[in-house]
Amino acid sequence: MKIAILPGDGIGPEIIAQAERVLEVLRRDGLKIETEHAPLGGAAYDQYGVPYPEATQKLAREADAVLLGAVGGPAYDKLDRPLRPERGLLAIRKDLNLFANLRPAILYPELANASTLKPEVVAGLDIMIVRELTGDIYFGQPRGIAVNELGEREAYNTMRYSESEVRRIAHVAFGIAMKRNRKLCSVDKANVLETTEFWKEIMIEVAKEYPQVELSHMYVDNAAMQLVRNPKQFDVMVTGNIFGDILSDEASMLTGSIGMLPSASLDQNNKGLYEPSHGSAPDIAGQNLANPLATILSAAMMLRYSFGQEAAARRVEDAVKKVLAQGYRTADIYEAGCEKVSCSGMGDAVVAAM
């Protein structure tokens, strides 16, 4: 199991270090894990002048999975767009043909008070959002900023999906629904956008291959509202790139801390890029304050989806549950009566729990 470790920017190196400690425990206990580091994002720009350099490309392609910290930061905001850290993330997703983004939103019982919603609204919350990653308005051509025939500046982007792109993400979502509670909600804006009307048609066609799964449809504006009003009605949600980007961030905050939430981006063969759902948090970088649990749980997702190591994945997840039950909290999830720990302190607790 060769893993490319890309610490990235901001708090990335700190949180990745704790995930590596967890992998080291598993390696000591017999899992054949091999790791190698490379830069991505701002760190890569600082070193190579580009956010996704050739050395990183080579390692990412050769590895069986990629574990990433976070990319970005205000220091890079003035760079030309192709050189910005986020472009490195888009490029590696494209390069590795990662088309399915899985974002779980799980509320741990111990953190029920961390959510801004009433505990009874979010108790037992466990949603999986499946987001298509390589199509839609983020990648559609033409795009740009230009001067029109009236001599006025204008900007334009193109929302576009091919049938094969929608079909393959549909199969991923239905497959996940089959392993869970057999409920799938497809989110679109079919009343206004032809692209998502097309999306809905294909979802209905693919559903015929999964008669055990109950498929429902919801407009994106209503879905955003329902996630706050009654989130427990959802089990698996599937949607396009831009809607998924927004809804998965919204769902993450139902849980009280984005610092708790992992994510996976998979290709056709379950090779994946695994990263926490949060950003690089430059305001707390280097202070040993970050919450490493999302990154540790991303490593657990990697063990499950890319390596089929279900027992190892559960061992990591159970260790996280145990440290929360023991009352350990980083600053972002701290509440009175708990024990506040640093980033490395949380790593210590998880390793001890394993």
Curated annotation (Swiss-Prot):
Keywords: Amino-acid biosynthesis, Branched-chain amino acid biosynthesis, Cytoplasm, Leucine biosynthesis, Magnesium, Manganese, Metal-binding, NAD, Oxidoreductase. SMART domains: Iso_dh. Its main location: cytoplasm. One of its GO terms (cellular component) is cytosol. GO terms for biological process: L-leucine biosynthetic process. It is an enzyme of class 1 (oxidoreductase). Belongs to the isocitrate and isopropylmalate dehydrogenases family. LeuB type 1 subfamily. Catalyzes the oxidation of 3-carboxy-2-hydroxy-4-methylpentanoate (3-isopropylmalate) to 3-carboxy-4-methyl-2-oxopentanoate. The product decarboxylates to 4-methyl-2 oxopentanoate. Homodimer. This is 3-isopropylmalate dehydrogenase. It comes from Chromobacterium violaceum (strain ATCC 12472 / DSM 30191 / JCM 1249 / CCUG 213 / NBRC 12614 / NCIMB 9131 / NCTC 9757 / MK). The gene is leuB.
